[in-house]
């Protein structure tokens, strides 16, 4: 039988620092939307970088989001953390610089947000968005 237990605060922070990929959940008008997402964790806040599109429209309409991060060795050995909070679009220079430094450290190529798709069909650059999630609720589970 598989035994699952709560993760400590420290274990959750370690997992968020060790990983850089999760699933961002948001909702608009009662419709959920979940997307894979690269992120960075600075020990306090989570940051993510994306191009304008469906997820930014959902977040602009309802900034309450959750980020689920996992580490799976096999079906019997895994850890998972769920972070709930508000996504705040960053616009202040100092905040943007701090967030981008954290993100580039974890994901130097900024993929997949920066790719060939950052140009529209007319060759114009697509707008980008940078967000911070301040964790309000954090839960974690692991197998033992």
At which residue positions do the language-model features occur?
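Amphipathic alpha-helical interface surfaces
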Residues: 12, 55-58, 95-99
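Short secondary-structure boundary/capping segments
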Residues: 13, 38, 56-57, 73, ...
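Charged, gly/pro-rich active-site loop segments
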Residues: 2, 75-144
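Extreme N-terminal tail/first-helix region
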Residues: 1-18
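Short beta-strand segments
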Residues: 19-51, 67-68
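Helix-adjacent hinge/juxtasegments
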Residues: 48, 54-81
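Structural motif corresponding to alpha-helix initiation and N-cap regions
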Residues: 9, 52-53
């Amino acid at each position: 039988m598989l035994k699952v237990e709560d993760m400590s605060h420290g274990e959750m922070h370690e997992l968020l620092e060790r990983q850089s990929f999760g699933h961002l959940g948001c909702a608009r008008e009662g419709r959920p939307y979940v997307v894979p997402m690269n992120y960075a964790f600075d020990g306090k806040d989570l940051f993510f970088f994306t191009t304008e599109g469906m997820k930014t429209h959902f977040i602009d309409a309802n900034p309450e989001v959750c980020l689920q991060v996992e580490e799976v060795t096999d079906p019997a050995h895994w850890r998972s953390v769920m972070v709930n909070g508000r996504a705040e679009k960053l616009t202040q220079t100092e905040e943007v610089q701090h967030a981008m430094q954290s993100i580039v450290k974890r994901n130097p190529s900024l993929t997949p947000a920066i790719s060939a798709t950052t140009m529209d069909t007319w060759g114009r650059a697509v707008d980008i968005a940078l967000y911070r999630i301040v964790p309000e609720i954090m839960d974690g589970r692991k197998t033992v």
